[in-house]
Amino acid sequence: MTAGVSPDDYSIEPELLLRAYATGIFPMAEEADDPEVFWVRPERRGVIPLDGFHMPKSLQKTIRQGIFDIKLDNDFDGVIEGCASGTGERARTWINGPIREAYKNLFEIGHCHTVEAWHDGQLVGGLYGVTLGRAFFGESMFTRKRDASKVCLAYLVQHLVKQGFVLLDTQFTTPHLERFGAVEVPRKKYEKLLENALDGIVRF
């Protein structure tokens, strides 16, 4: 921490955050109540190839049933609160105060977006991420109703392809994401993918 700066004053400026993403770096916190963040540049990066997304048959059925109303950028605060709640299998969360503030600021200037699943007028799942050039950097997702976040992910991939995005960065891979086609790539390969994605501008 910088000398003379209290934890309550710690913040991440939007320009700094976007520069970090442009070089393959992103912030995390150890715990939700941590006053600061640390910066991560993984040796191996998780990505979902937009031409290699795998949709399980059970999810296809759920989508056809039309259970969820999908909205974009409708309730950022609700989505990040859902992601930070740390319920169920995600008993811990890395989303602290500075991260909430930083991504809200990016949302307000058009560089952070949400995909939301609504059911009976309630937000029941969603995800958020950062956009820069033709890249989407997925940050976190949550679900309060079965398959809600999965439907959001499927919608996100379809939307990114339609809009001309070329990179969906998941930061890390998990068994859950691998079911949908997520793979790990070495840092050098990722940086080439990122360089290509930053060459161009598309609208979310």
Curated annotation (Swiss-Prot):
Protein's UniProt name: Leucyl/phenylalanyl-tRNA--protein transferase
UniProt KW Cytoplasm keyword: yes
Catalyzed reaction equations: N-terminal L-lysyl-[protein] + L-leucyl-tRNA(Leu) = N-terminal L-leucyl-L-lysyl-[protein] + tRNA(Leu) + H(+); N-terminal L-arginyl-[protein] + L-leucyl-tRNA(Leu) = N-terminal L-leucyl-L-arginyl-[protein] + tRNA(Leu) + H(+); L-phenylalanyl-tRNA(Phe) + an N-terminal L-alpha-aminoacyl-[protein] = an N-terminal L-phenylalanyl-L-alpha-aminoacyl-[protein] + tRNA(Phe)
GO MF term list: leucyl-tRNA--protein transferase activity
One GO term of the biological process aspect: protein catabolic process
Compartment(s) where it occurs, according to its Swiss-Prot or TrEMBL record: Cytoplasm
SUPFAM superfamilies: Acyl-CoA N-acyltransferases (Nat) (SSF55729)
PANTHER family: LEUCYL/PHENYLALANYL-TRNA--PROTEIN TRANSFERASE, LEUCYL_PHENYLALANYL-TRNA--PROTEIN TRANSFERASE
EC number from the UniProt entry: 2.3.2.6
Signal peptide region: none
Gene Ontology cellular component annotations, sorted alphabetically: cytoplasm
